[in-house]
A protein has these predicted regions:
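Phosphate-sensing "switch" segment of ASCE/P-loop ATPases
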Residues: 176-184, 192-328
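Conserved ASCE/P-loop NTPase catalytic core
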Residues: 65-221
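Contiguous, well-ordered alpha-helical segments that form the cores/surfaces of helical PPI scaffolds
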Residues: 56-69, 159, 302-311
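Pre-Walker A (pre-P-loop) alpha-helix and adjacent loop at the N terminus of AAA/AAA+ ATPase modules
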Residues: 36-76
Length: 344
């Protein structure tokens, strides 16, 4: 990769493990950012329903930011990575019936875009239209597909990210241009640890996706008993209404720009991620390294991280430390787990 271009972990100074003495600051109620107060209300209600570490878990932040990113020029493509039964699906269920939210449980190579004359272009052009949020609660099934099917699905996701394209056949060539889709799609995909096998191969998913490693809170037997016998359970309809209100209000608060220091931090992080995700070829027998490919260019990563940070600021405001903490967690999550452990 070139010694002069390598970014060290010390240069980036990422606090990937989290500092227990550096919790998100508590502001006085009179000074609190309005959307932040609404966010806390939603999170507190979820904590009555699920086991949540409200100080160190940023799943609600990340999902909310991805939803409001559809208002950006380039919406977010986010992978929520976590073990089965870690709460990912429960969070995503809270978005059901939200405007422009579309959930798919099964993907084939011809689901999102299709050249069939009766398909109206596929699910994205025909159902989602020009703008929407695509949610796949179990993207692991896609990773389990055969390589040819998987690559075709990845190709269609790249079209969705780029905001223009479609699928054509050799029969109806006269209508190819008319079938081309243009729009903006934000994506929220839930996936297990299997995604780690693909992070090391940037050519498969490219630098379009961001990742968030969601670690379920570990509790002991007494805590589990106390939680399971709680009388207080949130009203899901009320909770969904507040989430919808939070998203609407946050969309209106999206900042146009971010401070220069934060822009430099994000670009440095994007370059660091790109270097850590560089593809390495090894000998099949000896496992010796044969070739380290040039890292991907960080421009799309930089754009995605910048968009994420803007959305987090729209939720929490500039005075809160929570946007930077959530951003840092995503930066660490974008690096393959094994390589992350090595640099730690």
């Amino acid at each position: 990769m070139g010694a002069d271009n390598v970014i060290t972990n010390d240069q980036l100074t990422l606090d990937m493990e989290g500092d227990p003495d550096n919790k998100p600051s508590e502001t006085a109620p009179s000074e609190q950012f309005p959307n932040a107060a609404l966010f806390e209300s939603v999170q507190d209600q979820i904590a009555e329903w699920l086991v949540v570490d409200t100080d160190n878990d940023y799943l609600l932040d990340i999902i909310s930011a991805t939803c409001i990113s559809v208002e950006l020029e380039r919406p977010l493509f986010m992978m929520i990575q976590g073990a089965s039964s870690s709460g990912k699906t429960k969070y995503l269920e809270l978005l059901n019936n939200m405007p422009n939210f579309h959930k798919l449980h099964c993907l084939t190579p011809k689901t999102l875009f299709s050249g069939h004359s009766d398909s109206d272009g596929g699910y994205i052009p025909a159902v989602m239209g020009k703008k929407g949020i695509l949610c796949i609660p179990n993207f692991t099934t896609v990773l389990s597909e055969c390589r040819s099917h998987r690559n075709e699905i990845f190709s269609q996701l790249r079209i969705a990210y780029d905001g223009e394209g479609g699928r054509a056949t050799g029969v109806d060539v006269k209508n190819i241009q008319a079938r081309q889709w243009r729009g903006k799609i934000a994506c929220i995909f839930a996936v297990t640890q299997k995604i780690e096998h693909f992070k090391k191969n940037a050519s498969d998913l490219g630098e379009r996706f961001l990742y968030y490693r969601h670690n379920a809170k570990v509790i002991d037997e007494d805590e589990m008993l106390a939680w399971s016998t709680r009388d207080s359970k949130p009203k899901i309809s009320k909770l969904r209404s507040e989430i919808n209100q939070l998203l609407k209000s946050s969309r209106r608060a999206l900042p146009q720009n971010i401070p220069d220091d934060d822009m430099c931090y994000i670009f440095t992080a994007a370059r660091f991620i790109a270097q850590m995700r560089a593809v390495v070829d090894r000998d099949n027998s000896s496992r010796q390294i044969e070739l380290i490919h040039e890292p991907e260019q960080p421009f799309r990563l930089n754009e995605q991280l910048t968009g994420l940070y803007k959305c987090l600021l729209a939720i929490h405001g500039r005075e809160s430390t929570r946007p930077k903490a959530a951003l840092t967690k995503v930066i660490g999550s974008c690096i393959p787990e094994l390589r992350l452990q090595i640099i730690k």
